[in-house]
Structure formats: C-alpha cells, structure tokens
Amino acid sequence: FFACQSRVRDLGRREYSKHMLRLRREGHINGKEVPEIILLNSHDGSSSYQMIPGIFRFVCTNGLVCGNNFGEIRVPHKGDIVGQVIEGAYEVLGVFDKVTDNMEAMKEIHLNSDEQHLFGRAALMVRYEDENKTPVTPEQIITPRRREDKQNDLWTTWQRVQENMIKGGLSGRSASGKNTRTRAITGIDGDIRINKALWVIAEQFRKWKS
C-alpha cells in the first residue's frame, strides 16, 4: 500500500538502500484505523528482512509501529527466504487481534493533564535523551493539530505525541537559546525506533492505568 526508501549519499547504492513497505489485507484498504504488516529490507543483504505489526490512522496519516513484544520477525538473506518471509507474514497476521484489543483498551483509558504531560516528557527523553537539551516542552508535544484529536484518552494522546514528533515543525529553542524548529523524522531507522519506543511508553501507561 505504501513504499519508501532511505536516502543515500552514494547514488550508486540508491537501488540497494534500505526500504520499507506497509502492507494491508485487501479488506483493510480503507478505514479509520487499519492493521498493517511493515516490511523492512535492503537489496544488498546488509540487513535481514524484518516484519513488524503496525496500525495506520487515516485522520492524520500516522503510521504506527508496534513494540518488539508483538511478534517482530527477522529473516536473514540465506536459505529458503521466500518460505520464511511467507511464514513470518502469517505469524504477524496472527497478532493483529492482540494489537487491536490493546488499541481499544487504550481508547477507554482517560489521562488527566499531569499524566498527559508525563507521556510527553517520556517521549521527549526518547528523542533527545537529555531533558536539558529538548528544544520544545511536553505541552507542545501533546498539543493536538486537529479537532478530532482533542480527546484525553491514552490512544489519542499517543497519536498527538507521535504526529508532533515524526512530522516536526514545532517552534522551540536550541540548547544555546536560539529560536529553532523541530525537524521531521524522515529516515526509516529513526521512524521505526521512535515508533517502537512510543508504543512501549503507551503500553506501560495502559498497564499502569488498568
């Protein structure tokens, strides 16, 4: 359904760079939120095939990636690759119900303003590591970009944070005090890393609030 690839400085390696495919079942092309298989690969064999369950949210075009505890599959570039990829795809499909159940559970969990602030703070630590070097505040990260995202449940809070971090463009100040804007996360590895980390944070909140 969707494809992208990493940018490379050496144009001769453009056809061999890491790429990502987001795959959906035929009956899940449209919908408010649809489960996906995220396939990562590089044609030169420098990284193994990876298949990760995810969710695509149409209202903000957010592509979410589930954490490692939801059945990430890795297939090395050797042996019966096709057979292993097909088997791995079925394994990922098998966890879709669990992913959907957790999503629905998050929609039922209300977060007060302090809890939303804590979620935003944890997310910024994932991106910038040092709290003193974050160019924006947790309040900016949890601020909705559209009317549909003003709800205070865990699922929607997570969506706001994910979109603000991935798309960037937030006004802030650098460590030296200069005006700046947060950068969008455009690389495949960075996108996957942030998404996985946010899923883990959301899961921790779900368990804490349940």
PLM feature spans:
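Intrinsically disordered, low-complexity regions enriched in serine/threonine
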Residues: 5-14, 20-210
